[in-house]
UniProtKB/Swiss-Prot annotation:
Sequence similarity: Belongs to the chaperonin (HSP60) family.
NCBIfam families for the chain: GroEL, PRK00013.1, PRK12849.1, PRK12850.1, PRK12851.1
Amino acids binding ATP: T29, L30, G31, P32, D86, G87, T88, T89, T90, G413, N479, A480, A481, D495
InterPro entries per the UniProt record, alphabetical: Chaperonin_Cpn60_CS, Cpn60/GroEL, Cpn60/GroEL/TCP-1, GroEL-like_apical_dom_sf, GROEL-like_equatorial_sf, TCP-1-like_intermed_sf
Function: Together with its co-chaperonin GroES, plays an essential role in assisting protein folding. The GroEL-GroES system forms a nano-cage that allows encapsulation of the non-native substrate proteins and provides a physical environment optimized to promote and accelerate protein folding.
EC number: 5.6.1.7
Keywords (A to Z) from UniProt: ATP-binding, Chaperone, Cytoplasm, Isomerase, Nucleotide-binding
Signal peptide: none
HAMAP family: CH60
Enzyme class of the recorded protein, top EC level: isomerase
Source species taxonomy: Bacteria, Bacillati, Cyanobacteriota, Cyanophyceae, Synechococcales
One GO process term, biological-process aspect: protein refolding
Name of the featured protein: Chaperonin GroEL 2
Quaternary structure (record): Forms a cylinder of 14 subunits composed of two heptameric rings stacked back-to-back. Interacts with the co-chaperonin GroES.
């Protein structure tokens, strides 16, 4: 494949073009008065969305080079989404502002490497400041406020997530399901989540979200390695007759057996997914036994004289729903409260008897997993399109509340970053010099970009609002929903510190990468040769 190579200013300008396109399409969703974006789908109804990272994932440009710019800034959004689960639009707007200002300086002759050093130092300073300014979160009222803001000012959602956290605890699992009614409901069921994902991505049932969702599956639990597919055949045949999905949780599955499962899954013979059992040694066995109690099944282990090849369908556990992604597996079970309760009592007894603090800690973890249960939010909406939008908002809100519990909250609405700009300028002026100082000032100038965009989306002059906010105390900011300046914490307009921090770090990282780009190598678009004119028989587009 022939390549085209672009150097220096041309390379950076082409990247900038792609970044401009993506940033603009994502930035329109920012703030309480942000608009929606409609995504055309090849199949099914278009999707109406207010979620930065989902929009970013959809954008593909015709020009390869510009598309590289899109991919770079998409990475800032995705990384922020992975770390904090929210704040993707803010990260995109920040990265865009830093790149714009940085490229102006590079074009004027500044050294890109030194600028990047300045940007990195400024980023480290700001991360420390955000940590310092964060307020720890304590009551469910504050949790509700975080959820409300993240779900796009939907108070009902915020309240619901706060209730869910009250019921399952801060470490508890909150999972989303598509409900059957018009209203969004919350229920708490038994269930557990553990930190192992699917063994092969081919098990994913939803390829867009890379998740495997199994409804009412049978669950096969074993503490041995599955090496030969022959061991599994008797069970697989019994399950294929029932037409229900199967989840296999085993110590490991060797290549041959795994390949057979994947082929069956892809051909649609059997809806199956396989996960490695969590933990090691005796602890792995204990956790598998916990799962057996939870799902009302048996652990197939040779210690109990049970062999895989003799397993009957009655020995398998069942669950209402299992959701598996690349990192975690969530089992939502129901109907065996008594057995689960008895198992919890047994674990508590072991905790009282053990001397080792390490064992106590691990037993406590098992108890929390088993007793905490799973809060299931059933998303209700009038149409499929609204349901998808609501589900994305809820997901953001759940992630944001978890991030807030971890690292505390800061004033929201772009306020924190805007207030940190003067502090950064002062610090940079006293500690940095030359082009490093210019790099730090690029970051300082970009810090007001999210606030300005929120104001502009609400139909006001962003620059004026930013200057007004800077002149006020740290907690005061601009409430775009009704257009006045308020104490953000008191008004409940808050962001998780983790979201603000991740967005800033990822934006600075991507900006540094773009500024230090000196050359791009991309595929040359292939020239399509004109088809010869069809003459008589055999010509045209027909097969004879």
């Amino acid at each position: 494949m022939a390549k085209r190579i672009i150097y220096n200013e041309n390379a950076r300008r082409a990247l900038e073009k792609g970044i401009d396109i993506l940033a603009e399409s994502v930035a329109v969703t920012l703030g309480p008065k942000g608009r929606n974006v409609v995504l055309e789908k090849k199949f099914g109804a278009p999707q109406i969305i207010n979620d930065g990272v989902t929009i970013a994932k959809e954008i593909e440009l015709e020009d390869h080079i510009e598309n590289t710019g899109v991919a770079l800034i998409r990475q800032a959004a995705s990384k922020t989404n992975d770390a904090a689960g929210d704040g993707t639009t803010t990260a995109t707007v920040l990265a865009h502002a830093m790149v714009k200002a940085g490229l102006r300086n590079v074009a004027a002759g500044a050294n890109a490497i030194t600028l990047k050093k300045g940007i990195d130092k400024a980023s480290d300073f700001l991360v420390a400041e955000i940590k310092d300014k964060a307020n720890p979160i304590s009551d469910s009222n504050a949790i509700a406020q975080v959820g409300t803001i993240s779900a796009g000012n939907d108070e009902e959602v915020g309240r619901m997530i706060a209730d869910a956290m009250d019921k399952v605890g801060k470490e508890g699992v909150i999972s989303l399901e598509e409900g059957k009614s018009m209203t969004t409901e919350l229920e708490v069921t038994e269930g557990m989540r553990f930190d192992k994902g699917y063994i092969s991505p081919y098990f994913a049932t939803d390829t867009e979200r890379m998740e495997a969702v199994l409804d009412e599956p049978y669950i096969l639990l074993t503490d041995k390695k599955i090496g030969l597919v022959q061991d599994l055949v008797p069970v697989l045949e019994q399950i294929a007759r029932t037409g229900k999905p199967l989840l296999i949780i085993a110590e490991d599955i060797e290549k041959e057996a795994l390949a057979t499962l994947v082929v069956n899954r892809l051909r649609g013979v059997l809806n199956v997914a396989a996960v490695k059992a969590p933990g090691f040694g005796d602890r792995r066995k204990a956790m598998l036994e916990d799962m057996a109690v939870l799902t009302n099944g048996q652990l197939i282990t040779e210690d109990a004289g049970l062999k895989l090849e003799n397993a009957k369908i009655e020995m398998l556990g069942t669950a209402r729903r299992v959701t598996i992604n690349k990192d975690t597996t969530t089992i939502v079970a129901e109907g065996n409260e008594v057995a689960v309760q008895a198992r919890c009592e047994q674990i508590k007894k072991q905790m009282d008897e053990t001397e080792s603090t390490y064992d106590k800690e691990k037993l406590q973890e098992r108890l929390a997993k088993l007793a905490g249960g799973v809060a299931v939010v059933k998303v209700g909406a009038a149409t499929e399109t609204e349901m998808k939008d609501k589900k994305l908002r809820l997901e953001d809100a759940i992630n944001a509340t978890k991030a807030a519990v971890e690292e505390g909250i800061v004033p929201g609405g772009g306020t924190t970053l805007a207030h940190l700009a003067p502090a950064l300028e002062q610090w940079a002026a006293s500690t940095l010099s030359g082009e490093e100082l210019i790099g730090a000032n690029i970051v300082a100038a970009a810090l007001t970009a999210p606030l300005m965009r929120i104001a502009e989306n609400a139909g006001v002059n962003g620059a004026v609002v930013a200057e007004n906010v800077k002149a006020k105390s740290f907690n005061e900011g601009y409430n775009a929903a009704n257009g006045d300046y308020v104490d953000m914490l008191a008004a409940g307009i808050v962001d998780p510190a983790k979201v603000t921090r991740s967005g800033l770090q990822n934006a600075a990282s991507i900006a540094g990468m773009v500024l230090t780009t000196e050359c791009i190598v991309a595929d040359l678009p292939e020239k399509k040769e004109a088809a010869p004119a069809g003459g008589g028989m055999g010509g045209g587009d027909f097969d004879y």
